Amino acid sequence: MGCRLLCCAVLCLLGAVPMETGVTQTPRHLVMGMTNKKSLKCEQHLGHNAMYWYKQSAKKPLELMFVYNFKEQTENNSVPSRFSPECPNSSHLFLHLHTLQPEDSALYLCASSQ
């Protein structure tokens, strides 16, 4: 099987907690090929200043990818450039995905805090 035929599945578990928590993530599930470009959206209505993206790979601990505080990126744990966050305002944080690799198959989660 050639590399061109290999697809990378990015799965997002969304809505795992009740909607009244004030943090939502869309789309609920995302499957994409290695050449596609897609985005995940995180939205919070809690008035929090900080927002986060996490990655949970199979049989690995939860990994912090990006931290934004007051719309400014304060942490990036050497995340590959094929993942690019965007924080247009204090209640939205996007994770743009492109040219994914097989090792990118994971559960991606967002969160917010004071």
From Swiss-Prot:
It is found in: Cell membrane. Residues 22-114 form the Ig-like domain. Disulfide bonds join 42-110. It holds the Pfam family V-set. Its main location: membrane. Glycans are attached at residues 76, 89. It comes from the Eukaryota. Keywords: Adaptive immunity, Cell membrane, Disulfide bond, Glycoprotein, Immunity, Immunoglobulin domain, Membrane, Receptor, Signal, T cell receptor. GO terms for biological process: adaptive immune response; cell surface receptor signaling pathway. Coiled coil: none annotated. Alpha-beta TR is a heterodimer composed of an alpha and beta chain; disulfide-linked. The alpha-beta TR is associated with the transmembrane signaling CD3 coreceptor proteins to form the TR-CD3 (TcR or TCR). The assembly of alpha-beta TR heterodimers with CD3 occurs in the endoplasmic reticulum where a single alpha-beta TR heterodimer associates with one CD3D-CD3E heterodimer, one CD3G-CD3E heterodimer and one CD247 homodimer forming a stable octameric structure. CD3D-CD3E and CD3G-CD3E heterodimers preferentially associate with TR alpha and TR beta chains, respectively. This is T cell receptor beta variable 4-2. It comes from Homo sapiens. The lineage of its organism: Eukaryota, Metazoa, Chordata, Craniata, Vertebrata.
